[in-house]
């Protein structure tokens, strides 16, 4: 396997970044340069939430000039929402190849990619152009899902990997929040002027500017990587023969006294990785072995259930949902508050992720979503859409967001890398990620249509799925907190030795 060697460590321009203790240390600086991509991830997923109706008007998707919710607009909006997730499926599959050329290199590619994609989206004048641009945006998001967590994992202190890993999710939620916040400048939707809806010059500019914004964030990311954070990760440098370069970065992350231990840990990890590759089982081969097939299927089911909590319907389509419960002028304000809660409630996850077991958090998240949606469904069936019931529905969405932000959101991605043994980790985790994106498409694509029919249908579906998820986690999912790297609580040492040999476990 040919890997591009990037000997990018230079003596000049890097010495100003010194080791510092605490959470906001050297690692945090490097992580921040990567988390700008996480911000773009969240922003791109949510940006359509507040501007769809303006696109409908400018592109004239409805023959009636006073309507923005005709069948054609709902269908095209559904395609635009789902296209991001379809693109992400493709991008996540390609990302494993991209990171082989360097973790920092992959971030540079992502930032450059989003400059062009954001400009293309902002200048779109036809449905097919904006659909193509949104597919490309999704492809970039797919690249981010692998590249950023890998960069963070390899650029952080071993005792803080969990906390820093949550920063990826934190910046995703911050991007979601900013996307909805910027929608406030557009007011409460397109205004009817006489016998038709007409957009003001500001409205026509602003929705395009919102698509353009990731270009500015990407330029900032490129500047940070070129001017300040020029180094590749210590793992990548060591793996490609630049041991001295790896030492220099580790001094900044760990301090001079702990470099030898950190370097030895990298060497051991690389040796284990090589052994795992030599002994690796292909996904098809692993699926033929009952013990491996079991853990692969469990991971895929767990990953799929995350989307069936309804998180991406709220993130990508909260404005449409709140139209069923609120006056028009309060919709975007409530979406801003909801995304702010989503952002703020990710902070507790930074501190509890290493204190509470993964399984406990997953179970708690499911209970939270059930308590959020099930009472709403019952109330709407008994009393109908009264003001009190609508208020309960809104409160339910907030409880769901809080529950997800401190549990299923960040925990799933950590768990998927802890549940699989090293010989199938890469391929199995990739498959689980693919299933997650496919389930997102299944949930998001029809959400516009179902919301128009009845929000209760969605709430009932999410409630039932979370009840099933709770039972599934309770009886089939095992705790992974504190486990050894490369092992699995689902497959015994003897079972692994039987299939890959004693010397390679």
From Swiss-Prot:
Keyword vocabulary terms for this entry: Cell membrane, Disulfide bond, Membrane, Sugar transport, Transmembrane, Transmembrane helix, Transport
Mode of membrane association: Multi-pass membrane protein
Transmembrane segments: 28-48, 79-99, 105-125, 135-155, 166-186, 209-229, 295-315, 333-353, 359-379, 394-414, 431-451, 457-477
Regulation: Inhibited by cytochalasin B.
Chain positions recorded as alpha-D-glucose binding sites: 169, 306-307, 312, 413
Cellular component GO terms, alphabetical: plasma membrane
Cystine bridges: 62-70
Protein name, UniProt field: Hexose transporter 1
PROSITE patterns, A to Z: MFS (PS50850), PROKAR_LIPOPROTEIN (PS51257), SUGAR_TRANSPORT_1 (PS00216), SUGAR_TRANSPORT_2 (PS00217)
Assembly mode: Homodimer.
Organism this protein belongs to: Plasmodium yoelii yoelii
Sequence similarity: Belongs to the major facilitator superfamily. Sugar transporter (TC 2.A.1.1) family.
NCBIfam families noted in UniProt: SP (TIGR00879)
Lineage, highest ranks first: Eukaryota, Sar, Alveolata, Apicomplexa, Aconoidasida
Residues binding beta-D-glucose, per UniProt: 169, 306, 312, 342
């Amino acid at each position: 396997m040919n890997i591009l060697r990037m000997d990018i460590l230079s003596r000049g321009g890097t010495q100003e970044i010194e080791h510092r203790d605490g959470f906001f240390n050297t690692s945090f600086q490097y992580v921040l340069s990567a988390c700008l991509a996480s911000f773009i991830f969240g922003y791109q997923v949510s940006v359509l939430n507040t501007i769809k109706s303006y696109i409908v008007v400018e592109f004239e998707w409805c023959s009636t000039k006073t309507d923005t919710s005709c069948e054609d607009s709902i269908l095209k909006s559904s395609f635009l929402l789902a296209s991001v997730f379809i693109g992400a499926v493709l991008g996540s599959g390609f990302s494993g190849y991209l990171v082989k050329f360097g973790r920092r290199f992959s971030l540079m590619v992502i930032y450059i990619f989003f400059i062009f994609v954001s400009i293309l989206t902002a200048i779109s004048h036809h449905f097919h152009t904006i659909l193509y641009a949104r597919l490309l945006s999704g492809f970039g998001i797919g690249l981010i899902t692998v590249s950023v967590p890998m960069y963070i994992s390899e650029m952080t202190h071993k005792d803080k990997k969990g906390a820093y890993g949550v920063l990826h999710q934190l910046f995703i939620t911050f991007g979601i929040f900013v996307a909805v916040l910027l929608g406030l400048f557009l007011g409460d939707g397109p205004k009817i002027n006489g016998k038709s809806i007409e957009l003001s010059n500001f409205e026509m500019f602003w929705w395009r500017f919102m698509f353009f914004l990731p270009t500015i964030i990407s330029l900032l990311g490129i500047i940070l990587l070129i001017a300040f954070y020029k180094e590749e990760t210590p793992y990548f440098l060591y793996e490609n023969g630049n041991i001295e370069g790896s030492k220099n970065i580790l001094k900044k992350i760990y301090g001079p006294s702990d470099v030898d231990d950190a370097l030895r840990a990298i060497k051991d990890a690389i040796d284990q990785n090589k052994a795992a590759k030599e002994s690796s089982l292909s996904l098809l081969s692993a699926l033929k072995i009952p013990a491996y097939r079991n853990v692969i299927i469990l991971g895929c089911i767990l990953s799929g259930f995350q989307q069936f909590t309804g998180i991406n319907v709220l993130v990508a389509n909260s404005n449409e949902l709140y139209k069923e419960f609120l006056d028009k002028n309060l919709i975007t304000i409530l979406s801003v508050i909801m995304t702010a809660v989503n952002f703020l409630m990710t902070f507790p996850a930074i501190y509890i992720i290493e204190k509470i077991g993964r399984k406990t958090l997953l179970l708690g998240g499911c209970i939270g979503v059930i308590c959020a949606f099930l009472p709403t469904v019952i109330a709407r069936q008994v009393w109908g859409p009264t003001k009190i019931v609508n208020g309960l529905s809104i409160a339910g969405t907030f409880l769901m967001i809080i529950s997800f932000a401190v549990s299923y959101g960040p925990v799933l991605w950590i768990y998927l890398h802890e549940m699989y043994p090293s010989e199938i980790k890469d391929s199995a985790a990739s498959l689980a990620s693919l299933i997650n994106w496919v389930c997102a498409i299944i949930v998001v694509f029809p959400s516009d249509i179902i919301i128009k029919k009845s929000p209760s249908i969605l709430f009932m579906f999410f409630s039932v799925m979370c009840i099933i998820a709770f039972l599934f986690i309770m009886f089939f999912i095992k705790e992974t907190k504190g486990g050894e790297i490369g092992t699995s609580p689902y497959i015994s040492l003897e079972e692994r030795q039987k299939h890959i040999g004693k010397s390679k476990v």
